[in-house]
Amino acid sequence: MSGIALSRLAQERKAWRKDHPLGLVAVPTKNPDGTMNLMNGECAIPGKKGTPWEGGLFKLRMLFKDDYPSSPPKCKFEPPLFHPNVYPSGTVCLSILEEDKDWRPAITIKQILLGIQELLNEPNIQDPAQAEAYTIFCQDRTEYEKRVRAQAKKFSPS
């Protein structure tokens, strides 16, 4: 494991514990021996108020490579979501998560989670990752929002 990656992740965890957006969750997983695994984060993103996503809490895994922050983490909804920019595997398609697009080492976990939260209600139709969600979003917005509301209800924490 890279000392640079672990150092950066420890720094980010410390900053996150002091101040993070309401409702967002980001915690490292635990190794079999009980120690923290900073390279594997369990996250949760609440749907924004006033959107069809409201009420849902969507679980996401954030996996960091040894060369983080030179390369972005892989972000994957577990289970996968119905969304134009989420691959059927659950992996999020977002330009700031792609090394050859908009990733920069200065981008933080907080910025990534806020970016994904924003993406939920504002899909990028120029970069679709899921054919069914993309097609319904483009052709029948009412049906799309109905499905999103049902999904938010399904993933409601209460």
Curated annotation (Swiss-Prot):
GO annotation, cellular component aspect: nucleus
Pathway this chain belongs to: Protein modification; protein sumoylation
InterPro entries named in the record: Ub_conjugating_enzyme (IPR050113), UBQ-conjugat_E2_core (IPR000608), UBQ-conjugating_AS (IPR023313), UBQ-conjugating_enzyme/RWD (IPR016135)
Enzyme class, UniProt record, top EC level: transferase
GO biological process: cell division; chromosome segregation; protein sumoylation
Annotated protein name in UniProt: SUMO-conjugating enzyme UBC9
Keywords: ATP-binding, Cell cycle, Cell division, Chromosome partition, Mitosis, Nucleotide-binding, Nucleus, Transferase, Ubl conjugation pathway
Family the UniProt entry places it in: Belongs to the ubiquitin-conjugating enzyme family.
Nucleus keyword on record: yes
Assembly mode: Forms a tight complex with RANGAP1 and RANBP2.
Name of the gene encoding the protein in the UniProt record: ube2i
Species assigned in the record: Pagrus major (Red sea bream)
Active site per UniProt: 93 (glycyl thioester intermediate)
Source organism, top-level taxon: Eukaryota
Subcellular location: Nucleus
Chief localisation class: nucleus
Function text: Accepts the ubiquitin-like proteins SUMO1, SUMO2 and SUMO3 from the UBLE1A-UBLE1B E1 complex and catalyzes their covalent attachment to other proteins with the help of an E3 ligase such as RANBP2 or CBX4. Essential for nuclear architecture and chromosome segregation.
Residues annotated as site: Substrate binding: 100-101
EC number: 2.3.2.-
Keyword Nucleotide-binding carried by entry: yes
GO MF annotations, alphabetized: ATP binding; transferase activity
Chain spans, region Interaction with sumo1: 13-18
Pfam family, one: UQ_con
Residue stretches making up the UBC core domain: 4-157
